[in-house]
């Protein structure tokens, strides 16, 4: 599979160069330098968080663990990769890359970051630089650092993925599916949340710092906390449900997958079982709506109508129709987040609200839906998450009792269901030119079944 993906890289890099050509011409620059970044330190400490490469750098070169590296690009020329391999006996220096993709670059190895200055110099040309630059780079003569117009153009067009990027995301999805299967097995064997997390990391072969985001491993009521990352150490806790939101990465591209499991159908409240079945059905319906030209906001609003229908049908919501529950805010008590987001190099990929590539105008969220991360129309190559949720969150339920929405809620049913926490199902779905969406997540689970 790696060889097949390598064959897609040259066309991907040509696409990245073409984006840079247009962005540089529009913004009045002669060339581009992209800096990979440098690890920082914790306050008053000589240790710091794990290094995370600049996503713009990863768009050019799949080097996740390569600090103080640069890509320099002048339109019409081969891109230059300046690779920093320090002379260091405290830490193992990164190996000079030799993979097939490096043939597309002029590769130069340096021992000190300062040595890059002369290599990046382009005479009187106006160079824009993208990255978080250390103070000592301030005098290197870049015409601009992180210019807004340039970033806006590149961010907007990064939404549509190349065949290479889609191939990487399929691999990330496959890794994630393997991890999810291992995690469910550990849960059913009685492991703690922390031990389930360890089983996941072991199965995907990634250190915690290499995951695209912190794993959400929640038993029971913990599933009602949207970003529950506590990872409890005890095994002897209530565990009627298991919600896992965990992804993987391949060459810098992420997967973002959520599943909800029950411990034992026979011992589970029938109403919760009904809601589980309804959420599975409606999630697939929402995935099917990922088609070219479709307004993602409409998928979000459809999710509210469908979830409202499940709440009314199950008896959790009473005294109003599903349509009314979606309009009056009752559905938001149980589904308080957006239906999803763009996915790619970054888990919450950029420019989700952008009206165009100028960066000056945003497409507004629907009124009352402030947490929606994507408002654009879909186009071929775009990958989005579809993640409807239904939760029993104390804070929001308390607010409903205070603001009048509580009159539509069957509190006896809610109290019965609160120990289960909630339900979320999340797939990564690619919009295709043919119209039929490609569900990266479901395809991956089918391969590991």
Language-model features: where?
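Active-site neighborhoods and metal-handling regions in enzymes and metal-associated proteins
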Residues: 1-449
């Amino acid at each position: 599979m790696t060889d097949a993906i390598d064959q897609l890289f040259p066309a991907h890099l040509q696409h990245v160069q073409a984006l840079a050509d247009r962005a540089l011409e529009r913004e009045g620059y002669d060339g581009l330098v992209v800096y990979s970044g440098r690890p920082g330190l914790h306050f008053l400490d000589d240790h710091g968080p794990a290094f995370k490469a600049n996503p713009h750098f990863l768009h050019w070169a799949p080097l996740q663990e390569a600090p103080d590296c640069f890509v320099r690009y002048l339109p019409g020329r081969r891109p230059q990769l300046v690779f920093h391999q320090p002379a260091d006996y405290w830490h193992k220096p990164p190996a000079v890359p030799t993979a097939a993709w490096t043939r597309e670059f002029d590769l130069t190895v340096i021992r000190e970051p300062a040595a890059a200055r002369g290599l990046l110099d382009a005479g009187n040309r106006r160079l824009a630089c993208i990255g978080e630059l250390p103070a000592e780079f301030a005098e290197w003569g870049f015409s601009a650092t992180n210019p807004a117009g340039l970033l806006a153009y590149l961010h907007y067009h990064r939404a549509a993925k190349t065949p290479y990027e889609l191939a990487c995301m399929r691999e990330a999805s496959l890794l994630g599916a393997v991890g999810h299967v291992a995690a469910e097995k550990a849960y059913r064997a009685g492991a703690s949340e922390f031990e389930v997390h360890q089983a996941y990391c072991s199965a995907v072969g990634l250190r915690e710092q290499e995951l695209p985001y912190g794993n959400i491993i929640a038993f029971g009521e913990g599933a009602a906390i949207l970003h529950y990352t506590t990872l409890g150490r005890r095994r002897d806790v209530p565990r009627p449900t298991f919600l896992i939101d965990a992804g993987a990465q391949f060459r810098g591209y992420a997967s973002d997958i959520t599943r909800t499991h029950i411990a034992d159908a026979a011992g589970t409240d029938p109403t919760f079982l009904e809601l589980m079945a309804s959420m599975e059905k409606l999630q697939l319906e929402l995935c099917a709506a990922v088609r070219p030209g479709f307004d993602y906001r409409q998928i979000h609003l459809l999710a509210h109508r469908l979830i409202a229908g499940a709440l009314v049908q199950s008896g959790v919501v009473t005294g109003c129709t599903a349509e009314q529950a979606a309009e009056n805010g009752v559905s938001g008590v149980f589904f308080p987040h957006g239906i999803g987001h763009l996915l790619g190099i970054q888990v919450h990929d950029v420019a989700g609200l952008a009206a165009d590539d100028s960066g000056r105008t945003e497409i507004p969220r629907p009124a009352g839906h402030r947490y929606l991360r994507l408002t654009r129309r879909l186009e071929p190559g775009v990958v989005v998450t579809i993640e409807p949720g239904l939760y029993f969150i104390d804070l929001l339920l308390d607010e409903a009792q205070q603001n009048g929405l509580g009159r539509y809620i069957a509190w006896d049913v809610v109290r019965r269901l609160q120990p289960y926490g909630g339900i979320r199902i999340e797939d990564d779905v690619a919009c295709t030119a043919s119209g039929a969406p490609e569900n990266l997540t479901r395809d991956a689970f089918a391969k590991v079944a």
